[in-house]
Amino acid sequence: MIDHIGFPVSDYERSKAFYLKALAPLDYGLVMEVTQEEHGHDPAAGFGANGKPDFWIGGEGGLDKPLHVAIVAKDRATVDAFYTAAIAAGGRDNGAPGIRAHYHPNYYGAFVLDPDGHNIEAVCHTPA
């Protein structure tokens, strides 16, 4: 199951304002915003319903950045197995398995760039 998807935008503030209005009829609102200082990348805004950000926009300055797709893993061992298999298949490391506390205390994810440079993630939200 897809956990969340994220894609680059050319003008972060403009796109954030657009999605705030466009997604409102779907009961989607701004759930989380992550700054560059918090995670070392361009700012990102996560929209969703019921407190779960599953639709992310981010980046600044171009649409040539990779797509980001996160897939739910049943447990942390599965996240680890995904990472190992993806690297063995020719993927490039984009974040080894581990806690990403800037999202929430139990966010355990691993990130791999596919052959085209897209950021593929496996994530588990449950405690160890």
Task: Walk through the language-model features, giving the residues of each.
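Long, continuous compositionally biased terminal/linker segments
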Residues: 38-81
